[in-house]
Each structure stands twice: as structure tokens, then as C-alpha cells.
């Protein structure tokens, strides 16, 4: 079991740079992108589509994990253009057995390796910051693309509790991530 940090070292997201991405603290202006995602049929794997009010509650509660837990979502933007590309991060709302590595990308960012690049950076950050030896994905069994990505990132399917009893749980060994 992964323990939550005893002290909150990161009340706000640090900036993480990769070859193509800038991972940063989400800001209010990012909500329009989240709202668009949650209104779209692509959000079905997260329980959507959602109304604007529901999307706001999800967005605000996820961003609120930073001061409460010391981790949360990062907004991903293109380093060259500043274009918003999606979100990647560590989530643990009430009821999740352990912190989860999750992601979503805008429709225009799909198929470009954006989620993978962001996820690798977050895994390395989690290992370096918290010393965790693993992190899981909790993925709806119908979400073949996210399952494939979790496996491409080096994760393995394990029999462990997820956020939902039907979730496919993919575990990533972080010991080589930092």
C-alpha cells in the first residue's frame, strides 16, 4: 500500500519539462478544455459525458488534490507553441485504493505520443519525489487505447482492487523511473 506523504511538499504542481511538453499546475483557463472533453463521447470511459457543472466539480476536486495531498494533475502544453494538449497526473479521490496515474489528451493531440511522454515524466517525478516503488492505472475494460498505452509504458496487468470492481489494473514498476 502506498502511503500518502506525511507533509505536503508540493502544495502546487512543480513544472516538469520534457522534449516536447511543459507539465504545469492547471489554471482556470484550462477548464474549458476539460469541459469540452467531458461533454464529448470520449469521456465515456470516465463515466461521462458530464454536464458543465459536473465537469467543474471533477476538475476542481482533482486540482484541489495538490494542497491536500501533494500530488494531482498536471496540464500538458506544447513547449514550442503553448497549445494545451491535455492532462496527466496522479489522482486519488476518496474510494481509490492507491494513487492512480491517469491521463487524457485533446482530440488534436491523440496519436502523437503526448500521453505517453507526459506519463513517463510523472512516473519519474513520483519516484524521485515520494520514493514510490509502483503506481497503478485503473482503466475501464472497454478503453482499449488506454489499456494499450499502459502496457506500452511497461505496466503489467495485476489482480488488485481498482477504483471500480471491473477496472483493469495496470501496475508500473517505478524503481527504474527516476
Predicted regions span which residues?
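PAS/PAS-like sensory domain cap-loop motif
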Residues: 48-50
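Acyl-donor (CoA/ACP) binding surface of acyl/acetyltransferases
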Residues: 1-46, 56, 60, 64, ...
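Extracellular/periplasmic catalytic domains that process cell-envelope and extracellular macromolecules
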Residues: 67
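Beta-strand acidic-aromatic groove motif in beta-rich domains, primarily in extracellular
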Residues: 70
Amino acid at each position: 500500500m502506498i502511503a500518502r506523504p506525511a507533509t505536503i511538499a508540493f502544495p502546487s504542481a512543480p513544472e516538469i519539462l520534457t522534449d516536447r511538453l511543459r507539465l504545469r499546475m492547471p489554471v482556470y483557463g484550462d477548464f474549458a478544455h476539460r469541459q469540452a472533453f467531458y461533454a464529448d463521447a470520449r469521456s465515456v470511459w470516465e463515466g461521462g459525458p458530464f454536464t458543465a457543472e459536473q465537469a467543474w466539480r471533477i476538475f476542481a476536486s482533482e486540482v484541489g488534490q495538490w494542497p491536500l495531498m501533494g500530488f494531482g494533475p498536471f496540464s500538458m502544453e506544447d513547449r514550442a507553441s503553448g497549445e494545451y494538449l491535455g492532462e496527466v497526473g496522479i489522482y486519488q479521490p476518496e474510494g481509490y485504493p492507491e494513487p492512480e496515474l491517469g491521463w487524457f489528451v485533446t482530440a488534436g493531440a491523440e496519436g502523437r505520443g503526448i500521453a505517453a511522454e507526459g506519463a513517463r515524466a510523472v512516473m519519474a517525478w513520483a519516484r524521485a519525489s515520494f520514493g514510490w516503488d509502483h503506481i497503478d492505472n485503473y482503466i475501464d475494460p472497454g478503453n482499449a487505447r488506454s489499456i494499450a498505452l499502459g502496457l506500452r509504458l511497461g505496466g503489467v496487468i495485476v489482480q488488485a482492487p481498482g477504483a471500480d470492481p471491473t477496472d483493469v489494473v495496470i501496475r508500473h514498476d517505478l524503481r527504474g523511473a527516476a
